[in-house]
From Swiss-Prot:
Phosphoserine carried by residues: S651, S662, S664, S665, S684, S686, S687, S688, S826
Primary role: Regulates the endosomal recycling back to the neuronal plasma membrane, possibly by connecting early and late recycling endosomal domains and promoting segregation of recycling endosomes from early endosomal membranes. Involved in the localization of recycling endosomes to dendritic spines, thereby playing a role in the maintenance of dendritic spine morphology. Required for the activity-induced AMPA receptor recycling to dendrite membranes and for long-term potentiation and synaptic plasticity.
Outcome recorded upon mutating D591E: No in vitro cleavage by caspase-3. Results in loss of JNK activation
Name the UniProt record assigns to this protein: GRIP1-associated protein 1
GO molecular function, one term: identical protein binding
Marked site (Cleavage) residue numbers: D594, G595
GO CC terms of this entry: axon; cytosol; dendrite; extrinsic component of postsynaptic early endosome membrane; glutamatergic synapse; neuronal cell body; nucleoplasm; presynaptic membrane
Keyword tags: Acetylation, Cell projection, Coiled coil, Endosome, Membrane, Phosphoprotein, Protein transport, Synapse, Transport
Length: 837
């Protein structure tokens, strides 16, 4: 059993140790690969961060600065347009006010003329001529009536005196006083009729002037109402434009502030992320440095342990068990180191997942930034639409201003027509004055005669006429006051018109500025459209390139997937083989456990037999001593001894011991027979330590005690070996479980890893690892190439070390097998101390 332990268990331990070493090397290689992948991913993340920061800076500098400049330029252009429109409106208002002042002065002149016509001022030539004309017309009509009445009366008087002279024959001297007596009364009537006709004519003229004045004032009031309505509309449009301008300015300012706030927030977030990434990189670098130190320390420890093992194996064979224990301890340490490496690997995988998540977050943030850019473009389109609406409003204002200009031209034409009509009136008045002068020259003579009578009649009528004139003057004053109130109202309206003229000028200035801004915006729109077309072309080119790259990457990934599937199939096959070997090992362990239990039972039975034999031997020794004493006392030396030996040989206790020792399969007699038949050492340590031929009479008490002591020592060694066997079985079971778990971890890691480790048929592990490193390293990075070369050199050194270690382990295993064989063959000299000495 000891030989089975030494060969099978140590062979199995050797294979397990080799497998553990290979797994350790594979895990270290995978750790290096993970480190390389992690460094490449960190470099990629750093490169992506740099590119992202550059793109963000470029976007923020170009777009936000351009938008701010565009908004500021739009603001300046709008302000310039407003100023120009205000100036134009002021100019138009000033021109309208000048024309309105001219109209007011003309109205005042017309009112003065009307007043002079009403008052009949003699200082003015025109009104004096009009008064004379009226008076002469009235006098002419009155004289015509008087002439007709006098002719009728004269005809009657002429007929009546002729009849009287014929009938009575009186002299004509008496008739003259009768005919001339009513002459003063006729003159008075003539004057009265003249005054009445003159008043009628004056009243008709006053009514005509009042009607014309009222028509003119109503027309002016209508024009003023129209102008006021137009000015109100223009003022409302101006207020609306002002509010729109303020809203646009506020919106642009708010947008600029929001863009600045977003920019600051983005910068803070980027700084925080960069700091976090730097901290993580520092922590990862520290962990990598610690892992490297640990790996170097473990390598040194392993090398020292191997050297110590070699020294111990070469120095003493008895230290083989201690070396086995050291190997087991080293195995446990390797397990712990493997567990630590697995934990480190899980931590690295978690770090890789974190980096991937950060990469996805960065991609999502890029998408978010693109969405913000699209929103800004939409806002730009909204601003362009608002600008177009403002341009439409400006066009409407221009149309309104053109309508106002047309109305102004119509007013000017009406004023010119009024002037022409006034000039025509003046010409007619001049003609009438000439006619009146001619009539005056004709009727002067008649007036000279009639004036005397008229003056007499005027004395009586003047009082009544003065009363009527006072009434007329009072009416005229009331009308003048009314006209003055109307003039005040018209002046107030003219002031309002001046204010409206200013607003119209301002609006015209705004319209001009808006026209300029319109041209500028059209140019900017063309430039923006050209830039957008260029950007679309560039984006299409980049999209084509990205698609091509994506297709190439997809092909590469498909190849990698195929290779990984092949590797997975190979790993599955290997796993099936490992599972089979593990099941075989478990079956062997069960067999060994069962065999050990059987051996323990056999050993316990042998112990019982030996104890019983010991008890019988003690009894026999007591009997022998008694017999010896009896023989000594009876002086029977030789014959007694021979009888004692013969009696002992034929004693029932001896036969009983032989019969009892035959209970177990490995009995004392069988061992003696095997030793006598062959020189091969016994394979069981549970056999009896008595290897001498049956000469119990020659054994002393000291030899029996020594034999029992040796038996106890061999039993203790057996127990120690059983404990070691149990420990090795437990360790082999735990190692099998570790192997299953690690194979599952390796399979999951191979499934999750993205590294192309495709190994062509017939290639070695070294070429496959070189291809993996070449796939990991990009052709453009010189630093990565140097790193790749260093890793390849380190890998070659490690492989050479592994080969030497394999050779050393084989030598050690052979030495351990030899020492175990020697240890198994060592109980024979222990059982015969005389020969060994």
């Amino acid at each position: 059993m000891a030989q089975a332990l030494s060969e099978e268990e140590f062979q199995r331990m050797q294979t397990q140790l080799l497998e553990l070493r290979t797994n350790n090397y594979q895990l270290s290689d995978e750790l290096r690969k993970n480190g390389v992948e992690l460094s490449s991913l960190r470099q990629k993340v750093a490169y992506l961060d740099k590119e992202f920061s550059k793109a963000q800076k470029a976007l923020s500098k170009s777009k936000k600065a351009q938008e701010v400049e565009v908004l500021l330029s739009e603001k300046e252009m709008l302000q310039a347009k407003l100023h120009s429109q205000e100036e134009d409106f002021r100019l138009q208002n000033s021109t309208l006010m000048a024309e309105f002042s001219k109209l007011c002065s003309q109205l005042e002149q017309l009112e003065l003329e009307n007043r002079q016509l009403k008052e009949g001022v003699p200082g003015a030539a025109g009104p004096h001529v009009d008064g004379e004309l009226l008076r002469l017309q009235a006098e002419n009509t009155a004289l015509q009536k008087n002439m007709a009445a006098l002719q009728e009366r004269y005809g009657k008087e002429a007929v009546r005196p002729s009849a009287v002279s014929e009938g009575q024959g009186d002299p004509p001297g008496d008739v003259l006083p009768i005919s001339l007596s009513p002459m003063p009364l006729a003159e008075v009537e003539l004057k009265w009729e003249m005054e009445r006709e003159e008043k009628k004519l004056l009243w008709e003229q006053l009514q005509g002037l009042e009607s014309s004045k009222q028509a003119e004032t109503s027309r002016l009031q209508e024009e003023l109402a129209k102008l006021s309505e137009k000015l109100k509309k223009k003022q409302e449009s101006f207020c609306r434009l002002q509010t729109e301008k303020e809203t646009l300015f506020n919106d642009s300012r708010n947008k600029i502030e929001e863009l600045q706030q977003r920019k600051e927030a983005d910068l803070k977030a980027q700084l925080a992320r960069t700091q976090k990434l730097q901290q993580e990189l520092e922590a990862a670098n520290q962990s990598l440095a610690e892992l490297r130190d640990q790996r170097q320390g473990e390598r040194l420890e392993h090398a020292a342990a191997l050297r110590a093992l070699q020294d111990q194996v070469s120095s003493q064979s008895a230290d083989a068990q201690e070396q086995v224990e050291g190997l087991l301890a080293e195995n446990n340490a390797l397990r712990t180191s493997l567990a630590a490496l697995e934990q480190i690997q899980t931590a690295k995988t978690q770090e890789l997942n974190m980096l991937r998540e950060q990469n996805t977050e960065l991609a999502a943030e890029l998408k978010h930034r693109q969405a913000d850019y699209e929103e800004l473009m939409g806002q730009k389109d909204d601003l362009n639409s608002q600008l177009q609406e403002s341009l439409r409003a400006n066009s409407r204002l221009l149309e309104q201003l053109q309508e106002m200009g047309q109305e102004k031209e119509q007013l000017i034409q009406d004023l010119q027509e009024a002037r022409k009509s006034a000039e025509k009136r003046k010409v007619m008045l001049d003609e009438l004055a000439m006619e009146t002068l001619q009539e005056k020259s004709q009727h002067k003579e008649e007036l000279g005669a009639v004036r005397l009578r008229h003056e007499k009649e005027m004395l009586g009528v003047r009082a009544r006429y003065e009363r009527e004139l006072r009434e007329l003057h009072e009416d005229k004053k009331r009308q003048e006051e009314e006209l003055r109130g109307q003039i005040r109202e018209e002046k107030a309206r003219t002031r309002e018109l001046e204010n409206l003229q200013h607003t119209v000028e301002e609006l015209q200035a705004q319209v001009h500025s808006m026209d300029g801004a319109k041209g500028w915006f059209e140019r900017r729109l063309k430039e923006a459209e050209e830039s957008l077309l260029q950007q679309e072309q560039e984006q299409e080119e980049t999209l084509k390139q990205c698609r091509e790259q994506h297709a190439a990457e997809l092909k590469g990934k498909e190849e990698e997937l195929q290779n990984v599937r092949d590797q997975l199939q190979q790993a599955q096959e290997e796993r099936d083989g490992h599972v089979k070997t593990i099941s075989n090992l478990k079956q062997e362990v069960k067999d060994t456990v069962d065999g050990q239990r059987i051996l323990e039972k056999k050993g316990s039975a042998v112990l019982k037999d030996l104890k019983r034999q010991l008890h019988l031997e003690r009894k026999r020794a007591d009997k022998l001593q008694e017999r010896l004493q009896e023989i000594l006392t009876n002086s029977k030396s030789r014959t007694g001894l021979e009888e004692l030996v013969l009696s002992e040989m034929n004693s029932p206790s001896r036969t009983q011991t032989g019969d009892s020792s035959s209970v177990s399969s490995f009995s004392y007699r069988e061992i003696l027979k095997e030793k006598e038949s062959s020189a091969i050492p016994a394979r069981s340590l549970s056999s009896s330590p008595q290897a001498q031929p049956p000469r119990p009479a020659e054994l002393s008490d000291e030899e029996v005690a020594e034999l029992f002591q040796r038996l106890a020592e061999t039993q203790q060694e057996k127990w120690m070996l059983e404990e070691k066997v149990k420990h090795l079985e437990v360790s082999s079971a735990s190692m099998a479980e570790d192997l299953c778990r690690k194979s599952a971890i390796i399979e999951t890691y191979v499934m999750d890893s993205r590294i192309d480790v495709s190994v062509a048929a017939g290639h070695t592990d070294r070429s496959g690892l070189g291809s993996v490193l070449r796939d990991l390293v990009k052709p453009g990075d010189e630093n990565l190439r140097e790193m790749n070369k260093k890793l390849q050199n380190m890998l070659e050194e490690q492989l050479t070390k592994n080969m030497h270690l394999h050779k050393d382990m084989e030598v050690l295993s052979q030495e351990i097998v030899r020492l175990s064989k020697e240890c198994v063959g060592s109980p024979d000299p222990d059982l015969e101390p005389g020969e060994a000495n």
